[in-house]
């Protein structure tokens, strides 16, 4: 957020004459270097004093005014002929409380019939600085004339305190008044507004006006890069970044963060290296963005180098940097390093504790996650929704049903049981612990059931051997208009395979094809397993052969399908083909083929299959 600077009059304090029991400064104004110094004007205001020999400000007592009512008669406290707008603007900038701001405003209303615009601008900016947006808006609305600085100050004030809707409404009024876009700070405010509201088309129009007017400096161009990055327009962000004659840490961080968020981790790492080569030291936001890229790309070695840079260059290691480091190590499978970072952090908040609990739960260390959660509770830290989801997953992974039910009771007490993510995880927990009835009750009580909650129920029933219930839930899900995801298809096809429900399996195959889900390797593997389990090996191979991508699961499903249906030679051929394409044949596959091919000469079968594979190659 780029804050507006106040308009400062050129003042010079020349002497401080003593009048009665208080001091009153003599202010000299210099409007032009070619003119002579104007006559000194003595201003008599109580409590005015010189601060550090440089600026004038109000004494905290300021007993000359008896109230904050702007209509109150205080004419006895000052001489209106000796008060100047420039002096009042200077006092506004020196004031540290709204009480003084209102008194200065009252003085201006009493001394002058008309307010000049720049005094009103300073008054608005001072109110914004002290957080009184209501009074700032009253001043704004009461100004008979406004310029671009006036509108900018008010819009910037709303943005500063997160009131994007009010800022946007004010901008619409700005456009209706037909004021031209000429102020660089206004462009910065509008780009920040468009960034927060993801108003891409409006932001592009602002960009067009920037080009038309010819506005451009480092802050404006960085705001433009940040706007495109926040709207997910990576190409436009990079184009705007490349056109910058001068770059700063903010612009580098914006493009690195955009690359990381859009899944271009390698590109983000390359940009980060370029930033260092241009001698820019990253800040904590840059570090968090590049660590996210390392997490997604599993770039552990580079992540360690970033960690070393943070330590050596003494980059601010707040909870966000520490949490990003923990997340990077956890997603790269280095739980011990993740725990070391956690233990070395001097400050930990709910986000930090949630991150370490989620990391242990995700990597299968459920007991450790539960232990950390108990420590967190003893330290009286309030868990958020993500903490609850993580600890429920930890309970499910180790079968801690009792603790899960305790958490469920606490969830109901805190009135968060209708949260779809918490509800879906509760469904998964109860299914994992064999409590399908409790899982169904949770599902029924959810006000809106999304694909995650339905999939949790279907997967749970399928794993528990309740195939017919799983398929009924799939039917109900589709009737409610919820589109299945690849995990839903895989779970439902597993239920079809276990119950050998070929007709339903074919229907699911048709739906998956219609929704373009067949390209997913897990859906393809589940289809192979279903057709092979139902005895339709040729259809299983047709699915296998049409898969654009194969993994170990799909190879294994097809080989097992051949072997269990008595097609030993085909199984052996496929095993050799699998090995030739770089996949390791595990002992389970080999043992299955040996056990099912006992009625043929194995050496002859192996030799013929190998020869056949070499010929086809």
Curated annotation (Swiss-Prot):
Protein family: Belongs to the PPR family. PCMP-A subfamily.
Major site of localization recorded for this protein: plastid
Record's subcellular location: Plastid, Chloroplast
InterPro entries: Pentatricopeptide_rpt, PPR_At4g14850-like_plant, TPR-like_helical_dom_sf
Entry superkingdom: Eukaryota
Observed effect of gene inactivation: Albino lethal phenotype with severe chloroplast development defects.
Keywords: Chloroplast, mRNA processing, Plastid, Repeat, RNA-binding, Transit peptide
Gene3D superfamilies noted in UniProt: Tetratricopeptide repeat domain
Organs and tissues of expression: Expressed specifically in aerial greening tissues, such as cotyledons, rosette leaves, cauline leaves, stems, sepals, stamens, carpels and siliques.
Stated role: Required for proper chloroplast development. Involved in the regulation of plastid gene expression probably through regulation of plastid-encoded polymerase (PEP) dependent chloroplast transcription. Required for RNA editing of several chloroplastic transcripts, especially accD transcripts. Required for processing of the chloroplastic rpoA pre-mRNA. Required for the monocistronic rpoA transcript processing from the rpl23-rpl2-rps19-rpl22-rps3-rpl16-rpl14-rps8-rpl36-rps11-rpoA polycistron. Binds the intergenic sequence of rps11-rpoA for rpoA monocistronic RNA cleavage.
UniProt-recorded name of the protein: Pentatricopeptide repeat-containing protein At4g18520, chloroplastic
Lineage: Eukaryota, Viridiplantae, Streptophyta, Embryophyta, Tracheophyta
């Amino acid at each position: 957020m780029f804050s507006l600077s106040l308009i400062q009059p050129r003042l010079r304090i020349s002497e401080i004459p003593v009048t009665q029991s208080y001091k009153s400064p003599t202010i000299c104004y210099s409007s032009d270097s070619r003119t002579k110094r104007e006559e000194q004007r003595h201003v008599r205001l109580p409590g005015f004093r010189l601060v550090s020999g440089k600026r004038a400000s109000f004494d905290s007592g300021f007993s000359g005014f008896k109230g904050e009512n702007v209509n109150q008669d205080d004419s006895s406290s000052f001489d209106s002929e000796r008060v100047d707008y420039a002096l009042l603007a200077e006092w506004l900038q020196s004031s540290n409380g709204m009480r003084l701001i209102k008194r200065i405003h009252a003085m201006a209303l009493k001394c002058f019939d008309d307010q000049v615009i720049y005094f009103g601008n300073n008054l608005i900016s001072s109110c914004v600085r002290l957080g009184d947006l209501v009074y700032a808006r009253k001043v704004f609305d009461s100004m008979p004339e406004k310029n671009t600085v006036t509108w900018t100050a008010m819009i910037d004030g709303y943005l500063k305190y997160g009131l994007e809707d009010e800022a946007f409404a004010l901008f619409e009024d700005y456009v209706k008044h037909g004021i031209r876009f000429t102020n660089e700070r206004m462009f910065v405010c509008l780009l920040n507004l468009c960034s927060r509201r993801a108003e891409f088309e409006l932001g592009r129009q602002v960009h067009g006006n920037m080009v038309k007017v010819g506005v451009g400096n480092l802050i404006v161009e960085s705001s433009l890069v940040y706007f495109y990055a926040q709207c997910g327009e990576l190409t436009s962000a990079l184009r705007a970044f490349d056109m910058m004659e001068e770059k700063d840490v903010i612009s580098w961080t914006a493009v690195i963060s955009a690359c990381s968020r859009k899944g271009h981790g390698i590109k983000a790492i390359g940009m980060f290296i370029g930033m260092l080569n241009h001698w820019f030291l990253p800040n904590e936001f840059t570090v968090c963005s590049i660590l996210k890229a390392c997490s997604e790309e599993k770039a552990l070695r580079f992540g360690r180098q970033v960690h070393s840079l943070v330590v050596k260059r003494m980059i601010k290691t707040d909870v966000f940097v520490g949490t990003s480091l923990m997340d990077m190590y956890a997603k790269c499978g280095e739980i011990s390093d993740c725990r070391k970072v956690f233990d070395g952090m001097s400050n930990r908040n709910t986000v930090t504790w949630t991150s370490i609990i989620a990391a242990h739960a995700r990597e299968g260390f459920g007991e450790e996650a539960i232990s950390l959660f108990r420590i967190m509770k003893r330290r009286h830290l309030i868990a958020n929704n993500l903490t609850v989801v993580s600890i429920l997953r930890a309970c499910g992974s180790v079968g801690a049903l009792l603790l899960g039910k305790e958490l469920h009771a606490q969830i109901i007490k805190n009135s968060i049981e209708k949260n779809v993510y918490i509800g879906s995880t509760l469904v998964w927990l109860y299914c994992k612990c064999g409590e399908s009835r409790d899982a169904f009750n949770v599902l029924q009580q959810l006000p809106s059931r999304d694909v995650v909650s339905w999939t949790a129920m279907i997967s749970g029933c399928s794993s528990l051997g309740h195939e017919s219930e799983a398929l009924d839930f799939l039917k109900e899900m589709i009737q409610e208009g919820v589109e299945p995801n690849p995990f839903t298809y895989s779970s439902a096809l597993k239920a079809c395979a276990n119950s050998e429900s070929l007709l339903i399996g074919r229907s699911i195959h048709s739906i998956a094809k219609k929704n373009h889900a067949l390209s997913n390797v897990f859906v393809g593997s589940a289809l192979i397993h279903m057709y092979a389990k139902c005895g339709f090996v040729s259809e299983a191979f047709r699915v296998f052969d049409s898969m654009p991508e194969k993994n170990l699961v799909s190879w294994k499903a097809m080989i097992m399908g051949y072997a269990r249906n008595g097609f030993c030679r085909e199984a052996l051929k496929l095993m050799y083909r699998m090995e030739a394409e770089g996949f390791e044949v595990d002992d389970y596959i080999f043992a299955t083929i040996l056990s099912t091919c006992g009625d043929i000469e194995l050496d002859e079968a192996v030799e013929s299959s190998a020869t056949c594979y070499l010929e086809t190659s």
